[in-house]
Amino acid sequence: MKKRIIALFLLLTLLLTACKNNNNGGGNPGGNPSGGNGQNSGITGDDSSYGDDLEDLGAMDGYFEGDACDVTVKCISGTPGCYKIEGNVVRFTSVNAESVYSISGKLSGNIIIDTGDAHKFDLELQGFSMVSSVSNPITVLSGDEVSIQAKKDTDNFIYDIRPAISEDDTVSLSGAIHSEIDLEIAGKGSLSVVSSNNNGIHSKKDLQVKNLNLTVSCKDNALKGNDSVELEAAKCTLISTVGDCIKTTRSDISSKGNQRGTVSFIGGSYEVYAACDGIDAAYDVLVDSNATISIYTDKYSNYSEEVTRVSDDTYYIRFNYSDYKYSVKYYNSDDDYLWVNAEYHSTASGGRGNYYYHSFPKNGEYAKMQFFMYSSDMQQGQEKEYIVCSDYITLSDAYDTIALTARGSYIYYDWTNYTTTVNDFGHGGPGGPGGGMNDGNADKGDHSTKGIKSSNNINILSGSVDIKSYDDGIHANSGVTLENGSTSTGNVVISGGSLNVYSNDDGIHADGNLTVNNGSVNIINSYEGLEGTTVNILGGNVSVVARDDGINGMATSGAAITVDGGTLYIYCGGDGIDSNSRTSYGGILFSGGKTLVVSTSGGNSAIDSEAGYSYTGGTVVAVMPRGGMSNEATRCDSFASKGNSTSLSLNKGGYLVCEIGADKLIFNSPVSISALVVTLGDSGASVTTKSSDSHGLSEGEFIWE
């Protein structure tokens, strides 16, 4: 539960008021209109979570208890006699030709593939179940190429029931299937991999999943290829209960000249469930060939467990302002207390700003503590002069971080955990690069829970992608020094297919440029819908529902936002289209397409630019409450010749009808507004309302004629 600390000094109140984001009553714009561009999604617009029991998925059908080594191994082709069964270990050794072996039956033990580097080796699973409680089930040590294949019309099962591998254990392998070399998981049958306490499938090189029906359920990474992960024409259900689901770690160039670190989807169907990031790529993410992907993170995955990392000896204080010092008074009684000064510890990026950590030692000899905030010129460790102080707090064993939040004239605090970047298992760090702290979603933890995250670029060329994430739906980082020597660009490009995002933070965030060339983009729920250094809508159908800004262009010069084609709809509680560019009449460019923007907040504008914007083509309708900042929407270089503004009352469920040149818009309003309607395209535009219409539109739907 959040606690409130009353600010004792007006200085702090004024400072926080000046620095905080001013929504002026924005917030939720009031309902989630369905949008008017015909986009469909399997993602619901509520807090529903997803994921069936493993038993219902059939993943536990092959589990057995007790000791078993009832297996049949056959040489299908290639070098015969290249295996041994020693106790409960099946070992494949050197082959002198490309070879295919099969295995069936039950094994309580392990498989080791160590066939040398000269020839390809395939292991076919033909109705095979194995359970391992001592070491990881399958280890691939060598081979020119190694493929583990689920034979057509067979069901196969691998269970890793070992205890969790300790962070200090440098010998044990965390993956149920672990490979030191490039690994292919393929076939026309089915394979279920269940790792109770560790990773799913891990290749220290390239990992390829092709054709088969694959289910992986594990604690940490379901699929991890240090160099790359490629999924092609497969059907996968991938579950990570405390970590990132699909992950790469390297971003250098291989000896063959190949860029490492990309996660690729080439056709197929994939369900991804993650407690942290759904996809975390060290380089790029690529979606192509009509791949179908559904991603659920954090609380939207039924499999997620709490992700915590509690320090044994340190507490932290976290705040998003740097100019303060802190002290803690440990307390048992008026005669038994101890003052401790907090020291600066670290800074973490929060996307729209930084978060500053101060640390102080835990002291279990005291039952309570009270923390004090001081300005930079105040003395620490005293209670006569300070900015704010808490009440007495009971020491926590479950949490190690006191997170401070400024809201209005108050400071709030809440217990959470300082989660650092975690060993080889791949948990998200403090938000991961590019913003996982409490941005638009004040309830986020300190680990990154994005749908798709890359350290460079994200490209969606075709297919269908549904994301329901507790953090940003899609996030591309820039400014990361990659192992190939370059600096990441952080671009997101959507050139086709269908993208549907429900996010508790940003729908799509590009540290670099966000471009929609074609396809459909439907942001069902978000804090800010589309955000990038530049945002370019060049085609396709784009629909955005946002609690704050619909589109935010962060560039401070040039055209931060360009609309040049397609259909754009925004329904938001902040600024509809918001450019930070200070270029005179250049921060936003409308040059084509059809745009409808609805802002429900009186303190914001449907179109907001620092120094005006430009219009050269297309049709624009901007709806917002009269007064306030609405005059920003008329700061257009062509407004006198191409613009029109009309004041009217728009009722919830009523229809707005705009006739602008050859275009006609009919819009069923999801909210009542004493509106200013700004249009661009024809200075003689007709703007009217009516109570009914023959098109049968639901609230929030529209049609262009």
Give the location of each predicted region.
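Sec-dependent bacterial lipoprotein signal peptides
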Residues: M1-T17
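A composition-driven surface/loop motif
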Residues: L8-L10, C19-S304, T419-E705
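Short acidic/polar inter-strand loop motif in beta-rich domains
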Residues: V193, M373-V388, S692-E699
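A short, solvent-exposed beta-strand micro-motif common in secreted/extracellular proteins
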Residues: V209, E365-D377, A685-S691
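Extracellular beta-sheet/turn segments enriched in Thr/Pro/Gly and aliphatic residues
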Residues: S304-V310, Y386-G426, V678, S694-E705
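Short, surface-exposed binding/anchoring microloops in extracellular/periplasmic proteins
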Residues: E305-S333, K642-S645
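Aromatic-rich carbohydrate-binding modules that target alpha-glucans
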Residues: D323-N363, S376-I387
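Beta-strand signatures of extracellular beta-sandwich domains
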Residues: K325-K329, Q370, V657
